[in-house]
Swiss-Prot record:
PANTHER family referenced in this protein's UniProt entry, alphabetically: CHITIN SYNTHASE, CHITIN SYNTHASE 1
UniProt feature, compositional bias: Polar residues: 17-28
Gene Ontology CC entries for this record: cell septum; plasma membrane
Biological-process GO terms, alphabetical: cell wall organization; chitin biosynthetic process
Protein name (record): Chitin synthase 2
Membrane topology: Multi-pass membrane protein
UniProt keyword annotations, A-Z: Cell membrane, Cell wall biogenesis/degradation, Glycoprotein, Glycosyltransferase, Membrane, Transferase, Transmembrane, Transmembrane helix, Virulence
Compartment list: Cell membrane
Organism field: Exophiala dermatitidis (strain ATCC 34100 / CBS 525.76 / NIH/UT8656) (Black yeast)
């Protein structure tokens, strides 16, 4: 394995003999071999680019970054001064360029340290080399570290009119006669273009378990890079932030850029996802015959982890990240030079793997394949779409990847699924996006015992067997699941006017405050908007594909309240996004798709419009089917009076449950009324069993009726409208499901989940749809309030342009901190008991009482009206036409009741007058 040196003082450095043969005869110093000579009182003038042959060292060498380093080098003044001479001036920053290894002048502007002349610009005597035996000497603030004309700006002490007498410097540590440790950290570093960027040594305990460069050499395995981003994601590049992949002697080209977005997932869910990602990278590294991949494939892959809020991240998950080496506590800052930090960015190439033993996460040192990790810890909780902004707009612009893979924490990709997604783009140049099969995590089938999980498993399977392949055949998939999908980075880019897929996609982050309800609900399914905008992109012809061989496993809700809340967002977002796509179908004609492809798109959108109409009228259609089937059971040929009575009972309970569902959905949280929702689910399940029985019973009765006829033939059976309608509808759904499942060699869900799905179908139609449409005003993403994170120290600029950084001081501190993080997930977490918020509990109680009162009020009034008017089933029970008679009697009762009540009130009023008159008379007598 080739190690990527950060700039050894002895090998591959710009001061080494290999870089400058003319200095090969110089004798090494006792302190630091071949250390350049620096006079302490005068900074060197800016050097002219040297037209020399660049060193023939490894392309993976990282350039020395003096102002980034938090290590106590022997001559920090010269160290920073040297870097000041090579400060990048161009705005290009080397992004997307590959010729720096050939052109020293251009590479000079990409943070690479050029060969350095050891001669000072003045006639000062040369200082001797610093020695390890010297005691600690603090920096002198009145000596400029950088050139007056450097990009950091002139030294404040040289500015006329600047007074720093009021500045109180922190006390310096007492000088110690002990030798300086090489890895001893310092408290002061220079800001780089106003940005705080640190190269921090990783704990020696971690290094002891992985291959790495031996001291005094440094590589990407020995140091973690921290950047305190103080800007919006869209300004990350313009603020001259960069990433480690662009700092190698030959900047690495990123073929695969993988993002794992998380909120507060525990260490088990996070490790499950990362294990799947690591296995995919290892799989690609083992493809020795591939032209793209192979042994060094890991250098073309960057794994980005974006956590939505520093106060929200699970501490045990953060400890796992520290175990991997991509996080260190105590380094992050709240502010830098008065600017709030928006994201904390940690970079490290880890060789530590993860493994799961049950639900216990443990580290697996000396992993065969290194992985380039980029951990972005956002300061505030700003939703998942903001996490994607950091991924696409900030980091994507720097790395310029080919393919971007999106994964949610908790989703476990198959061992080669990411490769299969990449392969789809490689085989089809016009593939702009792709998705794999989302599977339900069943825990070896144990979770199928929960009917709700089994139903969702069936739903996912049939979607991946019927819906996704159909849409992929047309070239447009209505939604690429954000849990596991991939996009071609160039296909997502906006045009020169800033209009394009990403512009539409990210509009949902800031528009909720002033957008209409329709638009806000539409952006609950922002991934659907992205898919449509990608296919209809102006002057392009991108298509979307489904990759059956790429799989990702995920958990699904196993309780009714969580299930209802999840589907509320899905249903509202998908419905309004579908309306948007149908209304903007004309945009397809501005693309460069062929006429045949556009015609196929129109056919697909027509199909989706029909599906949307069926979804809109699903509740009405279901009631009509129920009404017709129950009415058919009341005939003499079927169940007679018993069927009629059962039909009336079911109809009353049906309408009452439907009404109760509306009332609950209008103002109650599912978490506050779990028993009520469970009762509704049970009723709809019983009703579906009744309807299934009715369908089978009517079919059998129809066949018996035809068989009993003298002129019976098989053709007469199909002439029976009842039989023919039932058979055609059942065969076109259930039978085709079986056939399609066998064609895809994936039929097992038909045997393990089919019945559960059939029984819970009314719940999907009634409960989920009613709750979704009754809560279209709720445009939240399920993101809870932003908790206040623990305040971090700030990095304030001191005279001389330096800031204080308080980090672990030595190996012992680093190891102690590392051990502390490992202990956080070394044992099983205590069982989490969610204590209900007292305020929420009281509010749920009040809302539940209100809903029950309103329900009782409406149902009793409905029964009264139905009984009097002989409707809602009473007309079927009472065969005589008694509607007029009942109405007359009821009207008479009402009139006499009104008269009686009026007479009663009149009597009371008269009695009041009598009492009043008598009282007045008595009062007058007594007064006299």
């Amino acid at each position: 394995m080739a190690y990527n040196r950060l700039g050894s003082p002895q090998r591959d450095g710009p001061y080494s003999p290999s870089a400058q043969p003319q200095y090969d005869s110089r004798s090494p110093s006792p302190g630091r071999p071949l250390q350049p000579y620096i006079h302490p009182d005068e900074a060197y003038a800016r050097q002219q680019p040297l037209h020399l042959q660049m060193p023939t060292a490894s392309d993976d060498r990282l350039a020395m970054q003096p102002t980034y380093s938090v290590e106590n080098v022997h001559n920090p003044q010269a160290y920073g001064q040297q870097y000041g001479q090579h400060l990048p001036d161009s705005g290009d920053m080397g992004y997307g360029r590959n010729d720096y290894i050939v052109s020293p002048e251009e590479h000079h502007d990409a943070y690479y340290t050029q060969p350095y002349s050891p001669h000072p610009q003045g006639d000062y005597a040369l200082d001797p080399y610093p020695s390890h035996d010297e005691p600690y000497r603090p920096d002198t603030d009145n000596v400029p570290i950088l050139q007056p004309d450097s990009a950091y700006g002139p030294d404040p002490h040289t500015q006329p009119g600047m007074d720093y007498d009021d500045y109180q410097e922190e006390p310096r540590p007492t000088p110690s006669p002990a030798p300086i440790r090489r890895w001893k950290t310092v408290k002061e570093v220079q800001l780089f273009n106003g940005n705080l960027v640190l190269d921090c040594p990783v704990p020696p305990k971690l290094l002891a378990n992985v291959p790495h460069a031996k001291p005094p050499e440094r590589d990407e395995f020995t140091h973690m890079r921290y950047s305190a981003a103080t800007c919006d994601p869209s300004d990350f590049h313009n603020e001259r932030f960069t990433l480690r992949q662009r700092l190698f002697a030959k900047p690495r080209q990123t073929e695969l850029f993988i993002v794992v977005t998380m909120y507060n997932e525990d260490e088990f869910l996070f490790a499950r996802t990362m294990i799947g990602v690591f296995k995919n990278i290892e799989f690609m590294c083992n493809r020795s015959s591939s032209k793209t991949w192979g042994k060094e494939a890991w250098k073309k892959i960057v794994v980005c982890i974006v956590s939505d809020g520093r106060a929200k991240i699970n501490p045990r998950t953060r400890a796992v990240l520290a175990g991997l080496g991509v996080y260190q506590d105590g380094i992050a800052k709240q502010q830098v030079n008065g600017k709030d930090v928006t994201a904390h960015i940690y970079e490290y190439t880890t060789q530590v793997g993860l493994e799961l033993k049950g639900t216990q996460v443990s580290l697996k040192p000396r992993s065969a394949t290194p992985v380039q990790l980029l951990f972005c810890l956002k300061e505030k909780n700003q939703k998942k779409i903001n996490s994607h902004r950091w991924f696409f707009q900030a980091f994507g612009r720097v790395l310029d990847p080919n393919i971007c893979v999106l994964i949610d924490a908790g989703t476990k990709p198959g061992k080669d699924s990411i490769y299969q997604l990449w392969k789809a783009f490689d085989l089809e140049p016009m593939c702009g996006g792709a998705c794999g099969e989302i599977k339900v995590m069943l825990d070896h089938g144990k979770k199928l015992l929960n009917p709700l999980v089994a139903t969702q498993n069936f739903e996912y399977k049939m979607s991946n067997i019927l819906d996704k392949p159909l849409e992929s055949a047309f070239g447009f998939i209505s939604v690429l699941p954000g849990a596991f999908s991939a996009y071609r980075y160039v296909a997502l880019q906006n045009d020169k006017n800033g209009v394009g897929p990403l512009e539409k996609y990210f509009k949902g982050e800031t528009m909720h405050a002033d957008a209409g309800v329709f638009t806000a609900n539409m952006y609950l399914a922002e991934d659907r908007i992205l898919c449509f905008e990608l296919v209809s992109k102006r002057n392009c012809r991108w298509i979307l594909q489904y990759v059956k061989s790429a799989t990702g496993e995920t958990d699904v809700p196993d309780r009714i309240p969580e299930f209802v809340l999840q589907r509320r967002r899905w249903l509202n977002g998908s419905f309004f996004a579908a309306v948007y796509a149908v209304a903007h179908v004309y945009q397809l004609w501005r693309s460069d798709h062929s006429f045949l492809r556009k015609l196929m798109f129109l056919i697909e959108f027509t199909y989706q419009t029909i599906n949307m109409l069926f979804a809109w009228f699903a509740i009405g259609n279901f009631f009509l089917v129920f009404r017709l089937l129950t009415a058919s059971l009341g005939t003499k040929e079927t169940l007679g009076t018993a069927g009629t009575v059962l039909g009336v009972v079911f109809e009353f309970v049906y309408l009452g449950t439907l009404l109760y569902c509306f009332i609950l959905s209008m103002g109650n949280r599912p978490q506050g009324n779990p028993k009520s929702y469970m009762m509704m689910v049970i009723f709809w399940s019983v009703l579906m069993v009744w309807l299934t029985f009715a369908s089978i019973f009517l079919t059998v009765k129809s066949i018996e009726t035809e068989v009993q006829q003298k002129d019976f033939s098989f053709s007469t059976i199909f002439n029976n409208s009842t039989f023919f309608g039932l058979i055609v509808s059942l065969a076109s759904t259930y039978v085709l499901w079986f056939v399609a499942s066998f064609l895809f060699f994936d039929p097992w869900h038909m045997f393990t989940c089919f019945l559960q799905y059939i029984v819970l179908t009314p719940t999907y139609i009634n409960v989920l749809n009613i709750y979704a449409f009754c809560n279209t005003h709720d445009i939240t993403w399920g993101t809870k309030g932003d908790d206040k994170a623990e305040k971090l120290p700030s990095a304030n600029v001191k005279p001389g342009g330096k800031v204080d950084v308080l980090i672990p001081q030595d190996d012992g501190d680093l190891n102690a901190q590392y051990d502390s993080e490992l202990k956080k997930f070394a044992t099983k977490p205590p069982k989490e008991v969610k204590a209900p918020n007292p305020a929420d509990k009281q509010e749920d109680y009040y809302k539940s009482f209100r809903s029950n009162v309103v329900t009782a009020w409406m149902i009793t009034n409905f029964i009264l009206v139905a009984a009097v008017l002989n409707i809602a089933g009473f007309d079927r029970i009472n065969v005589h036409d008694t509607q007029q008679q009942n109405s007359t009697i009821y009207l008479a009762v009402i009139l006499w009741s009104v008269a009686g009540l009026s007479l009663f009130r009149f009597t009371g009023a008269c009695w009041f007058l009598v009492v009043r008159m008598v009282s007045l008379e008595i009062w007058s007598v007594c007064k006299v």
